[in-house]
């Protein structure tokens, strides 16, 4: 009972702290100048993490302290960015969008809290607006909704083509961006605590390997998002797979399976409404059986290729929005994970040090004490102070010496 009373009291204190909350020095909008991000007139370096579960846990006021704990641990290490989902759709527990245009207010307030807490501590957010995958009601849920309304849809990739589904997505964009945060009283589209939106988490369109379908959708939706919210940066949420616009890269860098997903790193980001490039590095997912030396060699080629293309072809910053090494990888060791982090961070730092296009990296994923239901093979608890956490902290120290804006 004493524990419950303490949790309730903590939730009340946290909620009261947002009344009349003022912007911290790090709370300007992040913008872009060439291949660099800018915050308050200085280069802004992204050293961060993924925590897709923030809104889910914050839906219950009694568990919001877990978000506070994660952000406190992150800021103590100097981390500057968190990436979290802006979707949870369908007939699932704590859904955000329960049906097209219908939203659960309590879950929305969970997302409100995550944004408000990020603002309070000076962390910037990157928020994807839908999932390519079925998890948490991805594009499949939109297709199912359309089918239930009599639309003739045969594939989950009809998400990109069906006009009714496209309107569902646009309505979600409008609802999200026009939402007024119940804690900060600021509309999402006017909230500088958010750095950027992503159109989708890991967009793919396997029914059209030419890439034309996905390209048309990105073009249309990027312009639409910018018409609703011109304040924030926008990216695709891309994994970084190359397409027909760069056949040499496609042949030399792509995992073989990636040649069938209809994505094109160069073409999909070479749009005025897209402000920066996104990529992931899932070497443990794409190449399960690689030995460690081959894995590190791939990471080096993959990152350096994308950094070079962002610098010379796209002339935009690029963020590595997901990377890590899962404990379910064959022959996994903590030392191997540390090597993946060190290799990744070193490549990012070399580019950043020269004023290059590599703007930073976000590892997958952070969890907090008490959220073991979200724990996965790649999860990291920052308070554990593992050797990997020490590497994360050292990267922050090195990036900080470059003299830009590092967050609060």
From Swiss-Prot:
It is an enzyme of class 3 (hydrolase). It catalyses: Random hydrolysis of (1->4)-beta-D-mannosidic linkages in mannans, galactomannans and glucomannans. InterPro entries: Glyco_hydro_5, Glycoside_hydrolase_SF, MAN-like. Substrate binds at residues 85, 201, 364. Its main location: secreted. One of its GO terms (cellular component) is extracellular region. SUPFAM superfamilies: (Trans)glycosidases. It comes from the Eukaryota. The active site is at residues 202, 322. Coiled coil: none annotated. GO terms for biological process: polysaccharide catabolic process. One of its GO terms (molecular function) is mannan endo-1,4-beta-mannosidase activity. Glycans are attached at residue 73. Residues 1-23 form the signal peptide. The keyword Glycoprotein applies. Its EC number is 3.2.1.78. Keywords: Glycoprotein, Glycosidase, Hydrolase, Secreted, Signal. It is found in: Secreted. Belongs to the glycosyl hydrolase 5 (cellulase A) family. PANTHER family: MANNAN ENDO-1,4-BETA-MANNOSIDASE 3-RELATED, PTHR31451. This is Putative mannan endo-1,4-beta-mannosidase P. It comes from Arabidopsis thaliana.
